Amino acid sequence: MTLTETSLSHNAEEGKDEGGRLQQYKNLTKHEELRRRRTECSVEIRKQKGADMMMKRRNIVDVDEGGNSESELEEPEKISHQQSSTRLSNDEIRAILSNNPSEDDMVRCFESLRKSLSKTKNPPIDEVIHCGLLQALVQALSVENERVQYEAAWALTNIVSGSTEQTIAAVEAGVTIPLIHLSVHQSAQISEQALWAVANIAGDSSQLRDYVIKCHGVEALMHLMEKVDQLGDSHVRTIAWAFSNMCRHKNPHAPLEVLRVLSKGLVKLVQHTDRQVRQDACWAVSYLTDGPDEQIELARESGVLPHVVAFFKEAENLVAPALRTLGNVATGNDSLTQAVIDLGSLDEILPLMEKTRSSSIVKECCWLVSNIIAGTQKQIQAVLDANLLPVLINVLKSGDHKCQFEASWALSNLAQGGTNRQVVAMLEDNVVPALCQALLQTNTDMLNNTLETLYTLMLTVQNGYPHKVDILHDQVEENGGLDSLERLQESQSEQIYTQAYRIITQFFTDDDAGEKESHENADPQDNKWSF
């Protein structure tokens, strides 16, 4: 059985266990809904990080000018102080390596191979694989010559930065274990380059990540963490990025005990002086918390979350993973949601939303707040006390459509879970114009949220605050809400039609009470004439 077949079989069993665990949640509906939306929301925020957090990275060098690589590896004079000018073809490399090559011959061959694989466009990865040079590269990793090892590790880094098929070909050729061994090499340059390749393998898929774990990749990472203070920034960036790839993939997640070990290393990385290290480490924490409660709990137990909240005051490339992390934590049980509040995160949201120009940051802020509002009434009150309700209403009214969508969820969660007093706070903060404007949207989920919020608000006012009924009705009519409700009765969506019909018949008919009750009890799809 191949590596791929074995891993896929194992993952299928893990998926069954994951489904079983979901049924153990105290509030299953809340968890399933929030986690579904967490998956949907993750795409936009990941666009923001762009190339900074690609699953794979190539070590590219200008092969025509012989410049330095992207990685800016340390101590280049110790290993790469010579640059051969002659480029060898794959056939020439095969011929030299097949004829009892000297170490100088090997250096020349693997340097040439590395240069060809470092081309910015269309590196010849398939050609190298098909001509049988993968095995030569694997063997080179064990040659007692640091220059040979380094050039081979660099070439392999770029091979495993390719497609899944190319990466699997390298793994099945046996690259993983020797690369992991070299990742703890005494030479920092070799160590970093080998770890870079290992991180590319782990970043490909959950199957290959699990294979790296099986080959003791986590132990190698934690060994490096023991001396992280002695390593250069470039090396630590590679370590942090490797952590993120080890935490990244789902279906299945990495084993809980592995994530527990990694979480301890992340505490140190998020406090590093280098911003790129902190950024990659925080993305790793966001992946760690993108799972069931026991996984989120690891982040809380490790002590990493207070450092994540502190990122709210830093540059937006740190704010983005911090918001994603805390939003993930808030999808957990009420205790985990409370942990987000206790960290003081709500106090940071308002100034963050006021100063940012990024719609992605605003959207993530709304998503985080909506997850907290989906908690207890005490937690809803914490959001109101932080003066975030007017901000949500303003986003619903004037934000871009993705931000409006998240704000509509937040207000819908408030309407469904808040006390009467908390629900009426929306009216006092002038929510009606924003709701009426949202009724003009075409997104079905957003319309459903808005109609549900408006209905609950009107019902709450009618039952508990009768002196505000006329004010509320007038505001709905003056802002075009009644016209929109009448139009939505023609919607192709049965749910939207039913909700619009319910609001009109219950709150905007002038018939006597008996006739009103008759309408309420009638099937909204029953259009028969009655006399």
UniProtKB/Swiss-Prot annotation:
Coiled coil: none annotated. Gene3D superfamilies: Importin-alpha, importin-beta-binding domain, Leucine-rich Repeat Variant. Its main location: cytoplasm. It holds the Pfam family IBB. Disruption phenotype: Embryonic lethality associated with a terminal aneuploid phenotype: embryos display severe defects in nuclear envelope formation, accumulating nucleoporins and lamin in the cytoplasm. Worms lacking both akir-1 and ima-2 show reduced gonad size and aberrant diakinesis oocyte formation; defects are caused by impaired meiotic recombination. GO terms for biological process: embryo development ending in birth or egg hatching; meiotic cell cycle; meiotic sister chromatid cohesion; mitotic nuclear membrane reassembly; NLS-bearing protein import into nucleus; protein import into nucleus; regulation of chromosome segregation. Residues 5-67 form the IBB domain. GO terms for molecular function: nuclear import signal receptor activity; nuclear localization sequence binding. Residues 62-75 have a biased composition (Acidic residues). Residues 1-88, 511-531 are annotated as: Disordered. SUPFAM superfamilies: ARM repeat. Germline tissues. Expressed exclusively in germ line cells from the early embryonic through adult stages. ARM repeats lie at residues 122-161, 164-203, 250-290, 293-331, 334-374, 377-416, 420-459. PROSITE patterns: ARM_REPEAT (PS50176), IBB (PS51214). Forms a complex with an importin beta subunit. Interacts with akir-1. Nuclear transport receptor that mediates nuclear import of proteins, and which is involved in sister chromatid cohesion. Binds specifically and directly to substrates containing either a simple or bipartite nuclear localization signals (NLS) motif. Promotes docking of import substrates to the nuclear envelope. Together with akir-1 adapter, required for the import and load of cohesin complex proteins in meiotic nuclei. This is Importin subunit alpha-2. It comes from Caenorhabditis elegans. The gene is ima-2.
